[in-house]
Amino acid sequence: MLPTFVRFSRIMSSGIEHAKRMAAYKAVDANFPPHAKVVGIGSGSTVVYVAERIGQLKNKHDFVCISTGFQSKQLIIDNGLTLGAIEQFPKVDIAFDGADEVDTNLNLIKGGGACLFQEKLVASSADKFIVVADTRKKSPSDLGIAWRKGVPIEVVPNSYAVVTRQLKELGAKSVVLRQGGGAKAGPVVTDNNNFLIDADFGSISDPGSLHQQIKLLVGVVETGLFVDMAHTAYFGDESGEVSEQSR
């Protein structure tokens, strides 16, 4: 018999995956336009189930799907969907993506998966942007409460030292150049061949202002603060219940 802590961990993991699937399915069922032509599919563990649900649609060959990175490209292909590119289809009917954190005003922190620029590009091109997550990603108030790893910021590689200093001057408690971990020696390199910085500003009461201040720094490509972009967020909990938050 497995030790108690192992069995509990597996039960928790199973419950969380069930929550993600329920939220993803409801988000697609409630929002997918019947005559959509271009659909954005983001990155992350919850979006796996979004792509799964979209792949079950009877008219799935009537639209193209735009990816936000390598993972979502594979999800599109694996679910028998038609892959397109944002260069070909700059106007997106609807986009689905996950989030690292969602505040009470439906602002987001994204970028934990290192795809923030492409994710923001697709989301900003969409007529409707839908967020799907489990309840762990829901902040009780501001951003920076549930997600404690900092704001992901994509930067041009040779600017990271200068940007690091300037982020500290803006009030960041810590600024870390994200590393590749055991699979890669050295920093994470994005799909755009840039570096990622994680800057911890603590609780963020005005994400719009912080985003603008960071974007003004020379070398910053994009921030993981998604402000006033999401239309609706769906959160699944381990019981299978799905809650909805709209702007």
From Swiss-Prot:
Localization of this protein: Cytoplasm
First-tier enzyme category under EC: isomerase
UniProt-listed Gene3D superfamilies: 3.30.70.260, 3.40.50.1360
Gene transcribed to yield this protein: RKI1
Pathway(s): Carbohydrate degradation; pentose phosphate pathway; D-ribose 5-phosphate from D-ribulose 5-phosphate (non-oxidative stage): step 1/1
Taxonomic lineage of the native organism: Eukaryota, Fungi, Dikarya, Ascomycota, Saccharomycotina
Its EC number(s): 5.3.1.6
An annotated GO BP: pentose-phosphate shunt, non-oxidative branch
Cysteines paired by S-S bonds: none
Catalytic activity field: aldehydo-D-ribose 5-phosphate = D-ribulose 5-phosphate
Keywords: Cytoplasm, Isomerase
A Pfam family matched in the record: Rib_5-P_isom_A
Stated name of the protein: Ribose-5-phosphate isomerase
Originating species: Meyerozyma guilliermondii (strain ATCC 6260 / CBS 566 / DSM 6381 / JCM 1539 / NBRC 10279 / NRRL Y-324)
